[in-house]
Curated annotation (Swiss-Prot):
Superkingdom field: Bacteria
Single GO term (MF): tRNA binding
Gene Ontology BP, a term: translation
Functional note: With S4 and S5 plays an important role in translational accuracy. Interacts with and stabilizes bases of the 16S rRNA that are involved in tRNA selection in the A site and with the mRNA backbone. Located at the interface of the 30S and 50S subunits, it traverses the body of the 30S subunit contacting proteins on the other side and probably holding the rRNA structure together. The combined cluster of proteins S8, S12 and S17 appears to hold together the shoulder and platform of the 30S subunit.
Subunit structure: Part of the 30S ribosomal subunit. Contacts proteins S8 and S17. May interact with IF1 in the 30S initiation complex.
Family: Belongs to the universal ribosomal protein uS12 family.
Organism this protein belongs to: Nitrobacter hamburgensis (strain DSM 10229 / NCIMB 13809 / X14)
Presence of the UniProt keyword Signal in the record: no
Record flagged with keyword Mitochondrion: no
Name of the protein in question: Small ribosomal subunit protein uS12
Length: 123
């Protein structure tokens, strides 16, 4: 417990909580351009080739975004929209790329949870 004199010399500092998605800067989504589209492998118990893209955002940040769903049409210079949301088994991936927005096409033949993958209603 500090003394009164110690508190006068150096007052208590309020600890700031760490932001989970700093690149969004309080926005719900941000637009960006893909600089690299590639696959990477997940952490230990899991095994796969996860599709990710390095994205340069309009505010200058460079982030890694996960491409959800089966199959995608992204390549370098594709314009994409990102949202927050990490991928637990991919270290450093703290954003998701939105499907069916801007240059990203929706997932083909998707019947359930279509809104999450930008898929139109089947006829």
């Amino acid at each position: 417990m500090p003394t009164i004199n110690q508190l006068i010399a150096s007052p208590r500092v309020i600890q700031k909580s760490r932001k989970k998605v700093p690149a969004l800067q309080q926005s719900p989504q941000k637009r960006g351009v893909c600089t690299r589209v590639y696959t990477t492998t997940p952490k230990k118990p899991n095994s796969a080739l996860r599709k990710v893209a390095k994205v340069r955002l309009t505010n200058g940040f460079e982030v890694i975004g996960y491409i959800p769903g089966e199959g995608h049409n992204l390549q370098e210079h594709s314009v994409v929209m990102i949202r927050g949301g990490r991928v637990k088994d991919l270290p450093g991936v703290r954003y998701h790329i939105l499907r069916g927005v801007l240059d990203t096409q929706g997932v083909k033949n998707r019947k359930q949870r279509r809104s999450k993958y930008g898929a139109k209603r089947p006829k």
